[in-house]
Amino acid sequence: KFQTNNHIVGYGRPYMAALAGSVGDENALYEYLTKTCGFSMAGACGVLANICVESTYDPTNVTGRYYGICQWGDDRLRNMKNYCIQNGYSPDSFQGQVSFMVYELADYPELVTFLKTATDPQLAAQEFCAGYERAVDSSGAGAKYTGNLYPARRKNSYQALKKRMNEAERLFQSKG
C-alpha cells in the first residue's frame, strides 16, 4: 500500500482520506459509499449520519464496552478486530473499520439494496440504525423506528434516532 495526496491505496481496500475524525473522513467515506459501494446519495448520507452520531468519525471512540466508528461491542467488536488484523489493518484505523463495516454489510442484503436506491436520507438513517447499528434505547427516551425493512422492530425506540435523521438530512442538503 502507498500514500498519495492524503489517500491510502491498496488491493481490495477502501480508497479514502487517511485522516481520522475529520471532515476529510466524512467526504472520503461519502465518495467511497456512492462511487465504490453504489449507495445512493440519500443512502450514503444515512450511513454517514449514523457514524457521525455514534463516533464523530473517530475510530478510537469508546463508549462503555463499545468501540469504533460504529460502536461495535462484544462478538461484533471481536470480529472487527480479527478482520482488521487478518486483512492488514490496524483495528484502530478508519480504513480498517470501514472495510469491516462494508464486509459485514454483506450479511444485510435487503439493507444494502435499500441503501443503493434510497431517496429519503432520514429513512435511510432509520433503516441503517435499526438494521445495522441496532442501537436500541432501553430507556424509551429514543424515537420509535417507523421504517419498512424491519417491521418487527417498529415497537423499539432507538438511541438518538431523531438526531441521526436530522444529520442525514443536513448531509443530504449539503451534498445536493
Language-model features: locations:
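Non-catalytic cell-wall polysaccharide-engagement segments
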Residues: 1-23, 81-96, 102-176
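Export/targeting segments at the very N-terminus of extracytoplasmic proteins
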Residues: 13-56
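Functionally constrained cores in energy, signaling, and assembly domains
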Residues: 34, 61, 96
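Surface-exposed patches in mature extracellular/periplasmic domains of secreted proteins
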Residues: 37-48, 59-63, 110-124, 140
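Structural recognition of the beta-strand scaffold that forms the well-ordered cores
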Residues: 46-52, 58-59, 68-73, 97-104, ...
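Short alpha-helix boundary/capping elements
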Residues: 52-59, 76, 109, 136
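Substrate-binding/active-site groove segments that recognize
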Residues: 64-82
